Amino acid sequence: MSRLKKLYTEEIRKTLQDKFQYENVMQIPVLKKIVISMGLAEAAKDKNLFQSHLEELAVISGQKPLVTRAKNSIAGFKLREGQGIGAKVTLRGIRMYDFMDRFCNIVSPRIRDFRGFSCKGDGRGCYSLGLDDQQIFPEVDLDRVKRSQGMNITWVTTAQTDAECLTLLECMGLRFKKAQ
């Protein structure tokens, strides 16, 4: 069992139960999945660059990314239908908890001038953030990076409100800015 999964079952569930006074244990929020996505529209013109970003995403996440393709052709953007324009990975289970543990304890402190993430969720129990650079992940070989590439990370939970979601993620180790 993952260290973070064990922490969730032994401590975090009790903390959430005490704070939000759930009537049923099934109401306690759970982390369902983590989605990591990259928009690679500029890199789509260069196949080697596109492939290197796919490899970096695979190394970061631990599984092969799914290439997202264009639905329509748009001449103004020089985009053809079926052309690869991005990549995404959906993490569940043990890989999800391992990624969350690494992200909170290793990656977040490596972000320059890091003072915490924004406290704004989507209002339905999900939290998303954007990173400007993939080089903060220790798995990425800096000598092989051809171009800096950002990514979006979304945490999907069973929480009903932002407060529940942010409390769950904060208990798991994600650091947020203090409210002023």
From Swiss-Prot:
GO molecular function, one term: structural constituent of ribosome
Top-rank lineage group of the source organism: Bacteria
Biological process annotations from GO: translation
Pfam families noted in UniProt: Ribosomal_L5, Ribosomal_L5_C
Disulfide pattern: none
InterPro entries attached to this UniProt entry: Ribosomal_uL5, Ribosomal_uL5_bac-type, Ribosomal_uL5_C, Ribosomal_uL5_CS, Ribosomal_uL5_dom_sf, Ribosomal_uL5_N
Keywords of this entry: Ribonucleoprotein, Ribosomal protein, RNA-binding, rRNA-binding, tRNA-binding
Keyword presence, Cell wall biogenesis/degradation: no
GO CC annotation, single: ribonucleoprotein complex
Subunit structure: Part of the 50S ribosomal subunit; part of the 5S rRNA/L5/L18/L25 subcomplex. Contacts the 5S rRNA and the P site tRNA. Forms a bridge to the 30S subunit in the 70S ribosome.
Family annotation (PANTHER family): 60S RIBOSOMAL PROTEIN L11-RELATED (PTHR11994)
Family the entry assigns: Belongs to the universal ribosomal protein uL5 family.
Function in brief: This is one of the proteins that bind and probably mediate the attachment of the 5S RNA into the large ribosomal subunit, where it forms part of the central protuberance. In the 70S ribosome it contacts protein S13 of the 30S subunit (bridge B1b), connecting the 2 subunits; this bridge is implicated in subunit movement. Contacts the P site tRNA; the 5S rRNA and some of its associated proteins might help stabilize positioning of ribosome-bound tRNAs.
Protein name: Large ribosomal subunit protein uL5
Source organism per UniProt: Chlamydia muridarum (strain MoPn / Nigg)
